[in-house]
Design a protein with these regions (language model features):
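Carbohydrate-active catalytic/glycan-binding domains of CAZyme proteins
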Residues: 1-192
Length: 193
């Protein structure tokens, strides 16, 4: 992947969908789908080790992960990061590093009216064992203590909204991305990070 995060150099490499790479699927035998891999992969690198997180089955999904010393493999299935929970038949991971900690994003159906298609985004701190393996986690109500408050009068390089009514995002060459009101009594509620 190039610096522009859109284009790439070289050939696309396919990761073989093997039991060694993704673990053996439990339940009814399906020769076309012998592994736990379903969809939604997320690549992450930490301390010279590559992690491949993915939605794993059978449905209802859990989050599994594999590791490799090379981005092209071979990959070794390491187990479950997050078991099937939360009322949604599906789950997809995303991992970031922020202010010295790693965070694991996922979704569930915890909000009122939530289902497999009306999901809510959640975040947990991602913790590692000394050997690089991941500490399995459960879905929770989220991180209780914020890292830092947001200053509503300073430019924040992301449209951070805990709740909004009557706003939309726009973009221009001077400011970049921003949110704007669609009518006079529109608002956003800003919470902590």
């Amino acid at each position: 992947l190039n610096e522009d995060m859109i284009s790439y150099e070289g050939e696309i490499k396919q990761i073989p969908n093997t039991i060694e790479a993704f673990g053996k699927r439990e339940g009814k035998v399906n020769e076309q789908r012998p592994t736990t891999y379903e969809e939604g992969p997320w690549m992450y690198k930490r301390n010279n080790l590559y992690y491949l997180f993915f939605a794993a089955g059978p449905i209802s999904e859990h989050i599994g992960y594999s590791t490799s010393k090379s981005i092209t493999g071979p990959w070794e299935y390491k187990g479950i990061v997050m078991p099937t929970q939360g009322g949604s038949f599906t789950n997809h991971p995303g991992i970031i590093d922020f202010k010295g900690k790693s965070y694991f994003f996922y979704h569930n159906a915890a909000l009122p009216g939530g289902t497999g298609f009306t999901r809510s985004v959640c975040v947990e701190e991602l913790k590692f064992n000394k050997d690089g393996s991941i500490v399995q986690m459960n879905m929770t109500e989220g991180i209780k203590k914020s890292l830092t408050p947001l200053n509503p009068y300073a430019k924040t390089e992301a449209e951070t909204i805990a709740w909004s009514e009557g706003v939309k995002s726009m973009k221009n060459k001077v400011v970049g991305n921003f949110i704007t009101a669609k009518y006079n009594d529109a608002y956003t509620k800003v919470k902590e990070v």
